[in-house]
């Protein structure tokens, strides 16, 4: 199954830092939707990555990261960390949905005013709880610059315990490797 393959890959990446039972729970909780491999034509296949809760391929990475971060918060006895993400759509939706309700984590989604689809804007502005959406009068690059400047501010980082949910965070992009191993395994069966 996708979950079994993903667990094996995750164990290779994180096995020394996360106990087996917790890692398995993180992986299985992350992957609660199908990622079918579809034969498009002859020897051409497509892995459909739009079956997650926000219909974005980033759902896997965001959901995995949220659960992994939640695990480390508990393990290290931290009270709260703050996640910053700049978005023009997909990242904000996937991160907001993936982190919704995760204890000890507050997410701030920065997005450019009028430059995000209405559907995606609704996906991260209507959740409440531990998700705060901040509409920025500017471009995606302006949002990204604000996030980067927050990380450059040592006092702010110390006080708020900041991390990023953009693709610079290894916990967000490494789970995308699950796709390749799963697709290869499915092709071997075909």
Question: Model regions: which residues?
Answer:
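PLP-dependent amino-acid enzyme catalytic core
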Residues: 1-190
């Amino acid at each position: 199954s996708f979950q079994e393959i993903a667990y094996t890959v995750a164990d290779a990446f994180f096995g020394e830092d996360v106990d087996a039972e917790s890692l398995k729970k993180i992986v299985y909780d992350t992957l609660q939707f199908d990622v079918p491999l579809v034969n498009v034509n002859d020897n051409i296949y497509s892995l459909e990555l739009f079956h997650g809760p926000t219909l974005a391929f980033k759902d896997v990475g965001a959901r995995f990261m949220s659960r992994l971060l939640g695990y480390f918060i508990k393990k290290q006895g931290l009270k709260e960390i703050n996640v910053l993400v700049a978005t023009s759509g997909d990242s904000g939706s996937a991160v907001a949905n993936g982190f919704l309700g995760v204890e000890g984590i507050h997410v701030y989604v920065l997005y450019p005013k009028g430059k995000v689809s209405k559907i995606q804007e609704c996906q991260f502005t209507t959740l409440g709880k531990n998700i705060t959406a901040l509409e920025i009068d500017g471009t995606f690059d302006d949002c990204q610059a604000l996030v980067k400047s927050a990380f450059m501010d040592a006092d702010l980082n110390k006080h708020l315990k900041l991390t990023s949910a953009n693709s610079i965070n290894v916990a967000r992009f490494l789970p995308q490797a699950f796709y390749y191993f799963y697709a290869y395994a499915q092709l071997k069966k075909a």
